[in-house]
Amino acid sequence: MRILHTSDWHLGQNFYSKSRAAEHDAFLSWLLARAQEHEVDAIIVAGDIFDTGSPPSYARELYNRFVVQLQQTGCRLVVLAGNHDSVAMLNESRDILAFLQTTVVANAGCPPIELPRRDGTPGAIFCPVPFLRPRELVISQAGHSGREKQQQLLHAISDYYQEQYQQACALRGDRPLPVIASGHLTTVGASKSDAVRDIYIGTLDAFPAQHFPPADYIALGHIHRAQVVGGCEHIRYSGSPLPLSFDETGKAKSVHLVSFSDGRLSAVETLEVPVTQPLAVIKGDLAAITAQLEQWRGVEQDPPVWLDIEITTEEYLHDIQRQIQALTEDLPVEVLLVRRSREQREKILLNAQRETLSELKVEEVFERRLALTEIDDEKRARLHELFAHTLHTLTAEDENA
């Protein structure tokens, strides 16, 4: 039995006003080829197949086309909902996709299922655990402390997994079949990136790995960096196939090819996803940034590299942005983000705490507030325009009063 474990596709993501359609299309074509090459029996997508609950039409088209193409290979598809996914939207096509060897599990309550091999013989028992919404598991009661609510949710998730595992064992009987489980949540010690949202805000920070049942493999989603959980080789995050924030650059993206034999886990191979849209982060003062930009001088690069430029000086971002624009005009790069480093933002905030509003001009207050916000050039220019117009209007009113 072979499965491909993947997650966090985030189809339809808008990346600083840029579409990821071409990247996702290339990834799905690559994934389809790997499923055929390795004669995979099932692909498990552990949540966040879409980036929003109302994905654009092209994202739905990519999803539906992949289902049809995969069905023609004899490989099954299991789609679990993540915290970004809409239960209602996924359930819209669930019954139709079932005829195309695709199982969609959008919410809690789905019992374990049998995953067949390509030849139709039983291959594994699967516990299809999607993102578990607190309202599906616990009843909120007035008067409970934050600690009590945290423990209540922790026990509810643990109990749900144990119940799934017991049902899976009953379904397996004495057959030598592996038990596979899924999940879409943060585990204790997992390394997160900027694009990962907290999903149990105010109740549960992370789920302890020791509370998972003794399944042969646990395919997790939600964390965008591929990693083993708690030193347990059979509990893994596949990570996202694309970098979903600039702080995810520099590390390869992948899916896991998981093999079972004699009812047990036998091997996990990491398959690296090819890069179709390069991203890069450069940091420093203007001189350092100028030097780093030279690495693309004379390079033929298509598509252009998407850049995040982090400024480590106290100069006005607006002035630096104009200089960076001039520096990059003839380079195969596209600057999506210019921002201050976190250290500089904290320093500005600290200095601001020692000042009063009466010491600052209105324009300075606006610029400092803008410096703390990560937005693209187009929005920044629009905000400057709106601010200037508003200030002019107010000044004119004062003069005419």
Task: Please tell me what each predicted stretch does.
Residues 8, 28, 43, 48, ...:
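Divalent metal-coordination and catalytic microenvironments
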Residues 71-79, 303-306:
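Short, surface-exposed connector motifs at secondary-structure boundaries
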Residues 111-123, 129, 237-299:
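Binuclear metal-dependent phosphoesterase catalytic core
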